[in-house]
Amino acid sequence: IENLALIPGSVGAAPIQNIGAYGVELKEVFVECSAINIKTLNSKIFSLKDCKFNYRDSIFKNQEINKYIITSVKLKLTKKGYHKLSTNYGDINKLLGKSIPNPKSIAEAVIKIRKSKLPDPKKIGNVGSFFKNPIINKNLLKKILIKYSDIPYYFVDGAYKIPAAWLIEKLNFKGYRKGNTGVHKDQALILVNYGNSSGIEILKLSEHIQNEVYKNFSIKLIPEVVVW
């Protein structure tokens, strides 16, 4: 779980989102969670299978949305010597240098990376990454490569994951600002409220970005956030 260091929010929110960062997802260490039904106040245990985890998704964002309050989470951790480290993502290896990695050093590297790239929500209003990284098929990737040969992609379970930030930045939205709403200057996945922007304005900006990405790449960006 060291790769998940500094993700904002409470532990109870982790299963809802199946939080993930730097090559690791919660579902890899998840055992079960306890939750209380908002209407009946009855408690229920949700197993790994029950949660129906997917990429930044779970049963709590679909069939059971707004029905439960998660009160505790049980994780399965590994002992020293059996722990599988994940460092081949982002700038983790670059920060670690030639040192032998361990969970603590990886967590420290992740925290340093996040602090350097992500705005503090206490200072600038934001919800972190606004969009999921889209997953596309081989045929669409081939079409995109004809026009955008520099597009980065990763092979995942028979399909290809594209960094949403790259798509947004390619269309010059990084640092874009309209009134008090905008796209962060250092991280194109983050939409920000500079002071007095409304939720509607943020939503309109996200829809504008989605439309432009689809127009140029035929890729539908899906919001990672839950809009109330």
Give names to the regions the model predicted.
Residues I1-S34:
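A gly/ser-rich beta-alpha-beta helix-loop segment of oxidoreductase catalytic cores
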Residues S43-I200, N216-W228:
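Phosphate/pyrophosphate- and phosphate-bearing ligand-binding catalytic cores of soluble enzymes
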